[in-house]
Amino acid sequence: MYFAVITILPEMFTAISEYGITGRAVQNKQVVIDCINPRDFTTDNYRRIDERPFGGGPGMVMMAEPLAKAIAYAKSQASLHGCITDSEHCPVVYLSPQGDKLDEAAVVSMRHYEAMILLCGRYEGIDERLLARYVDMEISIGDFVLTGGELPAMVLMDSVIRRLPDVMGDAKSAEQDSFVEGLLDCPHYTKPHDFEGLQVPEVLLSGHHANIATWRFMQQVERTKQRRPDLWQSFTPNAEQARLLKKVNKTMK
């Protein structure tokens, strides 16, 4: 998968391109990450990419022209990597608190793209005309404001990359994460058996795989009910999960 990140701070992205699971995916050529600086597409000596807003007001606004040129260049690079560059295969995504909320369903959908062009804003934002003409979707990572789109872009990339085939060392790790089945994750334990008087649940030491699976599922259920009742309300169990819920509810009566 090809990612082009349009940013005035390309150095930030070494955190995702050189370290951890995402860095290994880059090293193994499962993912390509290009950082494109819009300053490289300016025409003045100061490489200026922002100006005062029309109508007055605080701060600066990123100008449309250098960003449009950066997007065109990003699409040309995606094409060189063999990607189809229309919006269905290579969307231009603006990271914005006004966008649609990033969730696991969106991540699963995004992993099927051939490429993504991620537009990182700064200052007061980006000229609306650029967004109207060039951006296919706006994505938010939460109802809060950051100093720029770089961190949200890294969050999006990390979440998508780890869902790509063969990126995770153990595919089951991704399958058991929170939200993948519509539930939060279960608790996890490792050595020692006793930590400051707190014991590992006996069922995890039993070696009985069916009982362990049931315990973990029910922990997911209880944790989701307590911490994210909104998720629980929308959860639809599969046949096996429905059987377990019915069995547990019956034993509790």
From Swiss-Prot:
The keyword Lipid metabolism does not apply. It catalyses: guanosine(37) in tRNA + S-adenosyl-L-methionine = N(1)-methylguanosine(37) in tRNA + S-adenosyl-L-homocysteine + H(+). The keyword tRNA processing applies. Its EC number is 2.1.1.228. S-adenosyl-L-methionine binds at G121, I141, G142, D143, F144, V145, L146. Keywords: Cytoplasm, Methyltransferase, S-adenosyl-L-methionine, Transferase, tRNA processing. This is tRNA (guanine-N(1)-)-methyltransferase. It comes from Psychrobacter sp. (strain PRwf-1). The gene is trmD.
